[in-house]
A protein has these predicted regions:
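Well-formed, non-transmembrane alpha-helical positions, independent of function
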Residues: 14, 115-116
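Active-site acidic-Proline motif in GNAT/NAT acetyltransferases
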Residues: 74-80, 108-110
Length: 121
């Protein structure tokens, strides 16, 4: 069963492992911990399948703008719609928290991410 929830500090090691599998320059564990340590201007969510974290997404909330920082899904779970569902939920949570605009940066070479963002509108 799929579940999307707010990330907690207890999720740091799982998020760190997803970082290692997903990015050529992943965040260090210390960076993941710093992002999860409860600052009101940070929002991180995880997506779980059968109680295992398969992806995460995060945003920084500044005034009325959300800046999506990272979206990552473990390689074995990619192409199953998890990224889209998680991104939609993250955007909804940003809007609930009063964000008027939401931004992200993506490499032009990241074709899978570009396709997902286009499909999300």
């Amino acid at each position: 069963m799929m579940e999307i929830r707010l990330a907690t500090i207890e999720d740091a090691h799982a998020i760190y492992e997803i970082e290692q599998q997903s990015f050529s320059v992943p965040w260090r564990l210390e960076s993941v911990l710093a992002e999860l340590e409860g600052a009101a201007n940070k929002l991180y969510m995880v997506i779980c399948e059968e109680n295992h974290i398969v992806g995460y997404a995060g945003a920084w909330l500044v005034y009325d703008e959300g800046q999506i920082t990272n979206i990552a899904i473990i390689p074995s779970a990619r192409g199953k719609g998890y990224g889209s569902k998680l991104t939609k939920q993250l955007i909804d949570e940003c809007l609930t928290r009063g964000m008027k605009e939401i931004f992200l940066e993506v490499r032009i070479s990241n074709l899978a991410a570009l396709a997902m963002y286009r499909n999300l509108g």
